[in-house]
Amino acid sequence: MDFSTMQVVVGFLKTSMGLQSIRDIVQKAKVDEKDKTLLHIHLCFFHANEMARDLNEGMDVSQIHSSAAIKYRAAIVTRHVKMNVETGGYDRKRMVEYNNETCVNWFSCEFKEEKEESQELPVDEDCVEEIVENFLENCGISDQNDQISTTSNANYAFGQGLYEYATRVSDAIVAVISGSIKKGIDEFLDKVYAAMSQIFAAWMPKIRAAFQWFENIKEVVKNWARTMHEKINCILVGMEDCLYMGAGLVAATCIVTLLEKFMVVTKILPAPCGAATLFLTTAMATISAAYVCTKAVEKSVMLTNVLHFVTTNCQIVLNALFNHDATKKELGANQNEGEAPTGVGQFGISTMLQDVANLMSTWSTNSVTEIGRTFGAISQIKNGILALRDMVYFVFEKLSDLAHKVLGFESQVLADLTILLGENVADWLSECDCMVSYMLEFNSRNREIFDRLSQLIEKGRLIRTGVLRTGHRGSSQVMALVTKALEKLIELHNSVVMSGSNTTRKAPFMVFFTGASGTGKTSVVQRVAINWLQEEQLGTNEIYSRNGQDPFWSGYKRHAVVTYDDFGAVPGTTSNEAEIINVISRNPYATVMAGLAEKGMYFDSRLVLASRNFLAANPESGVHDSEAYERRRHAVIRVSLKPGVPYNADDPCANQTYTLLDSKTPFREIQTFETYAELWSYLYTSFKEHEVQEELYLKSLPILDSDKKEALEGLVGLTVIATSFAPKAVMQYGMEKFPGHHFLVSDGEKCYFWHGDGSVESASVEQMQLSKQDVAQLKQQGLSTAMMYKDLAKAFPTLNSLAVLYAKNIVVKRWVGPDLEPTKTCEDVYMREQIGNLPKWQRAYLYVLSKYLTTQSPRGWFMECLEETKKNLRATYLWEYKQWPLPLKLALGSLIAIMAGGAIWYSLQSLWCMSGDASFVAGAATVFSVSSFAGQSDIPNRDNSERSFRNRKVRARTWQGQSSCFGDSALWIAETCMATLTFSNVRTQVCLAPGRGFFGVNHCLAAIPAGVMVKMDSSIGVTYFVWGKEKLLQFDGNEIALYMTSTLPKTVDSLLGRIHFDVETLPKTFSAVFFSYKYDPMIQQMVPELGSVTCKVHNKAYTLAHGEYRREIPQSLSYEASTVAGDCGSLILAEIEGKFKLVGMHVAFNGREGSASFMPYHASLDQKVGQGDFMLKYQEWAEPKILGPGCRAMGLIDPEHALAASGKTTFVETPEEWHLDYPCDKLPSVLARGDPRLAGTVHADYDPFASGMSKYAKEAGPFDAASLKQVCSGIVEIWEDASADFPMDEVDLDTAINGLENVEFFDALVLGTSEGFPYRLDRGPGDKGKSRYVSGESGSLKITDEGVLSDIAWFEEVSKTQVPDLYCIECVKDERLPIRKVLHEPKSRLFTVLPMSYNIVIRKKFLNFVRFFMKRRDVLTAQVGINPYSREWTRMANKLLSKGNNILCCDYSRFDGFLPKCIMNEIGNMIARLMKTDEVSRTQIKNLMLACTSRYAMCNRVLYRVENGIPSGFPLTVIVNSILNEILVKYAYWHCFEDNPSVQSNFDAHVSMVVYGDDNLISVSDAISSRFDGNFLVSFMEGLGIKVTDGIDKTKVGIEFRRLENCDFLKRSFKMSPDGTWRSPMSKESLWPQLHFVKAKKLEMAEAYINNCNNILRELWLHDVKEAEEFRNKVLRNLRWIGHEQLLNMQQLAVFHSEQMNGVSDFLSTCVTVDSIPLMDPLVPGMLPVKTSEIIPRVFVAAEKHFEGNFNDFFTISITTSRKFEEDKGFVLLFPYGAGRGGLPTTQFMRENVIRKGCSIQKKFRQAYEKGNNILFISQSSVVPSYVFAVMLLHSIGAISRLSSNKALTQAMQTCKRLEYLPKEYEEFF
């Protein structure tokens, strides 16, 4: 028989035992008197069997208990007595056998009947106990040895003992209710204890020996019940017995269950036998029989429902604490092995109330009750407090409905309890009293106090609303209580509202919304404000809408939120922008108020929301420093509409997109939010972070001292304000009766007046004969005025500390009376003396505060109101309570026990989790302590006492009495993974996943409703985000789910290696560590716990149940451990292959075993391959050294694979006389740790490898994908235009090795360089790099090594589908560095050697692309392959000057290290698009390029994993770096002009740029130079994590425009030659170190030195021929061992540079200017002049922006610039611009108005020129238009020849390409 059936039939037995009809039949039976007791027991069993037969025939419970059924069965019993008993057919022996058979069948289905000897039963009814004892003896209990004789007997005995125990408990309950027990609860508990002792008599010696607390069990249960009553603030005064009985019944059930477990653990019982179920059913059956069936038959069905409710309450507690239901189902499953077992999700004790509500919803067909929301909304845990409140409402509403049917009238008690408990009124009132105490203790003007008052008021309003919405309204006294408390709160709120902080405050958080009209900015502002108020639990009346036109802050009452609509649209007296500078500040800001009564208001709102169409400040705002305004906007959000998405009134934000912008110019994009939920998550998280920072700042400030003078000034100021509040009659009375006095304060009955000498006078209201209106006004303002005086005293704490430190005690204890003298309640003599010494004005306000805020009792004002309400209701309650039937009292008691006994149930739960008799006994002694029950259930943490987790001591779980192994590796996993997810008041454990996400238990995460605010608390920090159910990834057959979202912080990359995904590789059985980190409600903090478990891989499916949630789990990990509620999400850590890994997460418990699901794998977590067949041997560290997200040191390489790096430089220092007195600011770099040059300095331990790898710590970003694609697409279009004649296909292996002869940029593979890894391991003595792997003649070399060929094929094949891994060798670069980078701040650079096979594959794939890229540098931005000695340098200079002479020279920090994968992926797409490849080849190209950004780096023996950057040994490094450089600048440009598409899409029209690797020069036209400048680049790049400095002066802050001749490129400058070409001299600082250090590896030092001298000569020749000649002479003069023939002479240098410049042409053959040399000077080819210049004598050209002369000195022709001239001083030339004509007018205009003979313009010019005036042609941005006008007018009047105009206009065309139309349209000038 299963337990549920047993529960029913035992109930039948107890019902039978209580029937009066059976007693009557026994009395009438014709049997001996001594046999009547036995007959009564027999007939009860017989009647119970008849009830069971009715049940089997299909009758329901109500039919079985109906009057008709009872009468029918009574007739059957009567017939049985007549026919069988009285006739002798059933003698004493037969009746005992019948009874025994029934007990055997019911109490144990495994019990086999044993033959018993016949024995005489007692004949006296007083010997019933003896019958029981004999019965127990017959069932196998031996008093001599306290042992169980047989297993079957043990179960039988235990079951029967519990049967009797339950009977006695039930009898005691009935006795209490019936009044037979006069001493009440004590006697009731005494009888329960006696019954327990008698029934468990056989085991009492063991129980008493193990549990000394057993003797005190009565006091323990009383203490528990008393604690529960206090928890609900003693609302049940006079009705406590229902709580004591209900709590006693629930507690007794738990104790029985715990004792059963103890007996199983100690082997007294072989297995659990369902003691709790048996006890509950028999107890309820007894009550039912004794009360329902005898006293209330007509309502038996309803009362049976109530008793069933009581039983279920007890079972709910058992299930929540001990997973009792799971144990029962498991035992049932053992009988039916075909069914899958069930595990229970351990989500928390909060589900108990939900289970109660679910039960009550089945009481009637109308199971959905409207209580503000349907009960169906409660079926899943949702918004914490609201959900619990709704469930309490629902449960009490149902109980009230049933009580109405039972009582016949509506229960006022239950209706009031619905409100008092459902709305938690007592806790609200207690919080109000705490608030008053806090206000007295601290400055009541604080924003925190003000907000807390607002929260309490909002909560009170919600309570009042809840009272009105209930179906059972409750008493008027309860409604009056809520109203009275709410009015007092509002009075308190008003008393502090006219104030604020006049000291340093928290700066409010400002959110600025911008966007086009009609995008819905205002609706977003309103929604953000409402959501913020909801999260902060404030009412909607806390929003203040600021009117920008109002010079006053009319209506401002320190609202929490201030909104500005159309911010600054119409400037007022003070603009919104100017106002914000003071509002968003930490300085106090006094608002300008209209009325005198409102003076003294200070702004201290917490959130400011503004919306406006424009980003920048209004030009008329009066803000001179725009940055001061812009930086006050903490978040700038641009609102835009999603194309094609219509407006939805139900969700106004559904069609909006939000873009986070930088608050400062140029307002670059930072992040885009596609949904409002994502935006709200970001804003609320940012707000919380802002609040934390502001609090830290305020805590750092010192307490300011003050003096008496300031205090008196403040007092006078307050009296002025108080005077303005007081009625005129009061002021008049004070002037007449108390001249020289000021009105101080009033308590509503007396008024106090203060004099400057400190005296205080008083007068009663009756004396002043005030009207009722004046008295009301005094009462209304009294508290407010007193609070202001109190705050004044708090502001001057050093003057009178007593008024500050003891203000609370003085007020609360009423130590000051109305006469302002100490009262009798202040018994301390010293304190009375101190109070008497207080100034009278302080005593006055302290008295008034006590009058308003306290009562005569020691309780607070609000709790005293509750006490008064309880007193008024007590008589009504007691009258009603007497009418209640027993089941209803038990129902209420057990329900409140569930709600109020949380700490007790947690204590019992912790006791259940203990294993072993020793730990169980020790834990029970603590839990059942009479003095305290809370916080005592922890096991002493011995084995791990030295362990800590997040600064908390790790608590051990010793389930099997063994210590837990928890090494540093496992601790690192827990520290990295463990996180707490909090939604509303629910906390659950989750595990951070690689990337941006976390693993969690599905039955927990799936219950979170979409759209709620969720908090993630981990080692990374706290993040708030809005829950999106669509982001929850679920896995078939696995209870662990994965949640991925971009709003979470990114975890460390190394986490992936510590998670074990492969279930098949796990052993069938293995040891593991169970680690949890969850909230302990008893100690009110997070507690880390761990324990050892033995895991088994369980391949049998089971069903996981959690509330209504059901899911079948086919495979899991199981372990014997008594886990508890809240353990779901705990980590299962196991040692796999020598190191700890995460193998699973705990998800369920079935009453005996815990269950965990395996970690699910998802493709988004990782993708991993290796390098060919080679496996690098290394020892991985348990805790990798994290340099940053992009780089971590993983471990040590085994010696057999390690490569030793040489620490010796190849540079040799030359003798001092060879230095020739030239300076040297460079030294050879530091190549290894322990460099002797650093000995004794702070850098003595400098490691160049660790320092060099740090550049890879973090990648740049984030980048906007759409913008990045646009920029890259534009670059590829230029490539495609330039690549028409270039093949782009892949070359064969021979070409990749040998190159192509006579084809530029198709060089052969360099064989002398390193071969890379792992080939470097095979290098023998004398071997040279790659050369040993090839054979053949030069030009026809072939690879002969099969291993290299195999690796080449492997790279080509694998890269088609995946990114191959690389093993790279890091070497310190042996170079000369500035002294500061060697001695002062060592900074050596690393060179990366890649595998030879990989490099060859790269050459095969990209050689044609490289040739194109270098060959077409004439049109491309990148100048890779440029010859600085050739005319290319001039071409490059001209290209830059084509946009003007505003040039930016930038220098990047960590350029090699920050290349992100997203850009490398785009570069791969760009190359693939140019090569026109198919999809497979495109993937192969990208994977090959991404391989170098995700590689293993070998630094000596340390192995690093690098996830970004580009290695220097990559064949395409300089090309990729050049592309990256170009992308970054164009990406910045794109975002700079995103508000101007026409400029944004025309980069080349406004900017000319050249790049070479990380070097760049950016020439910006005048038209955009004010916006796209160095400051913008620095700021924008900083937002991407990139540091950019000035390329010339790296110590300079910011980047300024330079002229070309002041820039450098590739360490070379620009110098103009006389012939108009540009030279590229290298900086001299880079030349002289060649004289100090030489590389003498191949040559002797002298030969190397001479080579260096010749290099210097070549470079000096570019500076100046004379300098080169002087240097040559100095070398020959000082170093006579050098012959003159060894150094290049001037002629040889000239020939060299001529050949470099012109190929075969003579460099000295220069063009001779044919005419008018001065005319040519201003316009150098490629240069856009802006400086005022004289082109021929007396004729000047100038640009408007750069002209600094005096117009009075010239006859001015002003071209399109508005200016007035006198007739003889010039004129303005206005004309319509021609499209694409370089700033010149149309041809028709020029011919008719400029060059036509005799035209007005020409005539005026001729006259001025012939008069000898200085003539000035001035145009706007450059001199080009004025230059062309001047040349044409000079030629038209014959001042210059046609040849001169030809030359001049040709050079103008070279400067401005748009003038190319001139020869065609103006042939006469050419």
UniProtKB/Swiss-Prot annotation:
Disulphide linkage map: none
Protein EC: 3.6.4.-, 3.4.22.-, 2.7.7.48
The keyword Nucleus appears for this protein: no
Annotated Gene Ontology cellular component terms: host cell endoplasmic reticulum; host cell membrane; host cell perinuclear region of cytoplasm; membrane
O-(5'-phospho-RNA)-serine sites (modified residues): S937
Segments forming domain Peptidase C3: 963-1165
InterPro entries, per the entry: DNA/RNA_pol_sf (IPR043502), Helic/Pol/Pept_Calicivir-typ (IPR004004), Helicase_SF3_ssDNA/RNA_vir (IPR000605), Helicase_SF3_ssRNA_vir (IPR014759), PCV_3C_PRO (IPR044067), Peptidase_C3A/C3B_picornavir (IPR000199), Peptidase_S1_PA (IPR009003), Peptidase_S1_PA_chymotrypsin (IPR043504)
Keywords: ATP-binding, Covalent protein-RNA linkage, Helicase, Host cytoplasm, Host endoplasmic reticulum, Host membrane, Hydrolase, Membrane, Nucleotide-binding, Nucleotidyltransferase, Phosphoprotein, Protease, RNA-directed RNA polymerase, Thiol protease, Transferase, Transmembrane, Transmembrane helix, Viral RNA replication
Transmembrane segments: 910-930
Site (described: Cleavage): Q346, F347, Q936, S937, Q962, S963, Q1171, G1172
Annotated active site: H1003, E1039, C1128
Binding positions (ATP): G515, A516, S517, G518, T519, G520, K521, T522
One GO biological process term: proteolysis
Any one Gene Ontology molecular-function term assigned to this protein's record: RNA-directed RNA polymerase activity
SUPFAM superfamilies (UniProt xref): DNA/RNA polymerases, Trypsin-like serine proteases
Every RdRp catalytic domain range: 1445-1572
One protein family per Pfam: RdRP_1
Record flagged with keyword rRNA processing: no
Catalytic activity: RNA(n) + a ribonucleoside 5'-triphosphate = RNA(n+1) + diphosphate
Domain SF3 helicase: 486-654
The protein's name in its UniProt record: RNA1 polyprotein
